[in-house]
Regions:
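Phosphate-group recognition and catalysis centered on beta-loop-alpha active-site segments
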Residues: 2-17, 21-311
Length: 311
């Protein structure tokens, strides 16, 4: 997707110009306020492809990255194989404006960029075109059986999740490096029908470590559910609740008191804030954070966590 604004929907252009025409007014994307009223107070059930979760909702971290190379189509397929509906992944932007999945801001750790482009250090995602990134192997580092697995575009990943009937927790990775990426992501999601839900949080949630980016997403798409990654001081939680529906800390930073304090505050949609924690990969830890009252657990091995959680 190009950075050029030619051909952008009017709602995106209006929002970027800060004459914000709310996304709620876009026909076919979000319901009207009246249409949504009957569901406004309803908290979505924690479900997987296999049925209802018991306890915290489980999210496959970067796909089921314990079983396949992170942030690839193979990882989404692995998550589906574990019966996990919600998939977390990270999105960045190439030099020519394509949205691609990558956790690090450089390509070196999870691709063969150093071999393919030896003179392009430090191999920043933002310095490569989509075509150049498409030449890279994003799977061989994980295992020979994944050699040749490509870096997916966001479009490719959405298509895979659609095929698998999965849902998306999408992290905007270092969005300050990519001005305007929030509107571009929303445009991509809208083009692929991911915002056509009575309550979009039932299918897609956008999160980031950068509060300004989360706020921007909320301003552009106020019905969309958002999350802030981190552990804000309890006294500041009401400020975050103006634009974030989730506060998502590292598991090491959690206490029962902190979780309860977050959940006592209502977010921008009038529902209690939720707490999703990361990255939890063993049963003992999973039960500890579940006992703290978290709403969700993000894991590389969600099936292991699911099997270990006490009923």
């Amino acid at each position: 997707m190009s950075n050029a604004t030619a051909g952008w929907p009017g709602w995106i252009l209006g929002a970027v110009a800060l004459t914000v025409a709310p996304v709620t007014s876009l026909p076919g994307v979000f319901p009207s306020s009246a249409e949504a009223a009957s569901t406004e107070g309803v908290r979505p059930a924690a479900t997987t492809a296999l049925g209802h979760e018991r306890g915290p909702l489980l999210v496959a971290h970067r796909g089921a990255s314990g079983y396949a190379p992170e942030n690839t189509v193979a990882a989404a397929q692995a998550a589906a194989g574990t019966g996990t509906t919600w998939v977390e992944t990270d999105v960045q932007r190439t030099s020519d404006g394509e949205l691609v999945l990558m956790h690090d801001t450089t390509l070196a750790r999870t691709t063969d960029a150093e071999e393919v482009f030896p003179d392009r250090a430090p191999w920043r995602v933002a310095d490569f075109t989509a075509e150049e990134i498409s030449r890279l192997d994003a799977g061989g580092w994980f295992g020979e059986e994944f050699a040749g697995e490509p870096v997916p575009t966001l479009e490719d990943f959405l298509d895979e999740l659609d095929d698998n009937r999965q849902k998306l927790l999408l992290e905007l990775k270092s969005p300050s490096l990519y001005p305007g990426i929030e509107a571009e992501i929303l445009e991509e999601l809208g083009d692929h029908g991911w915002l056509r839900e009575w309550y979009p949080g039932q299918r897609v949630v956008l999160q980031s470590f950068e509060a300004d980016s989360v706020r921007t997403v909320h301003e552009l798409a106020p019905r969309l559910e958002t999350g802030f990654l981190g552990t804000p001081p309890v006294a500041e939680i009401p400020e975050y609740a103006e634009f974030a529906d989730q506060i998502n800390p590292r598991h090491a930073d959690l206490t029962e008191e902190y979780v309860a304090s977050v959940q006592s505050v209502r977010g921008p949609h009038g529902r209690p804030l939720k707490v999703y924690t990361w990255t939890v990969n063993d049963g003992e830890l999973a039960n500890r954070v579940a006992d703290l009252g978290v709403d969700g657990i993000i894991s590389d091995v969600p099936d292991v966590v699911r099997a270990a959680l006490r009923p």
